[in-house]
């Protein structure tokens, strides 16, 4: 640990790797809400948040675990699930009167085609007005899971049972992921209107 009178201890949340205060200050200066995307190895959380001096106010929220309520059988942390989570959160935000936001990716790197931008595309497709560049969005085939279905078709039954055991436990054949994705999106549209 550094010592001396010139040593400055960073803020606790900065030390823990949770908050980039410089980026946060730029985001809260806007009069718009923030679409906050947070990813873990198991799930994704998408929230629409407003700044308030006494603490941020969550206007709408969705977690990828909630997709099972709409019939989604795929994994909760893949690109399809993150897109649907962004879509669900935006539908809830629109129902509460929020029509525009800016993207807040926290400490994640802005990598073209990443899951963070899949959530952004889901929110934009649901009707939320968010500024973005088309180049950063993932391909449509990655969002709806066609690449997983194509990969599964190239495998034999033993490899499918080994690599997609969780899908099979839930009753989903990997080749049917795009169809399940579309059904889930339709169910979200029907339930959130």
Curated annotation (Swiss-Prot):
Pfam families named among the record's database cross-references: Ribosomal_L5e
SUPFAM superfamilies xref list: Translational machinery components
UniProt protein name: Large ribosomal subunit protein uL18
GO MF terms, alphabetically ordered: 5S rRNA binding; structural constituent of ribosome
GO cellular component labels: cytosolic large ribosomal subunit
Function of the protein: This is one of the proteins that bind and probably mediate the attachment of the 5S RNA into the large ribosomal subunit, where it forms part of the central protuberance.
Subunit organization: Part of the 50S ribosomal subunit. Contacts the 5S and 23S rRNAs.
Keywords, alphabetical: Ribonucleoprotein, Ribosomal protein, RNA-binding, rRNA-binding
GO biological processes: ribosomal large subunit assembly; translation
Entries under InterPro entries matching the protein: Rbsml_uL18_euk (IPR005485)
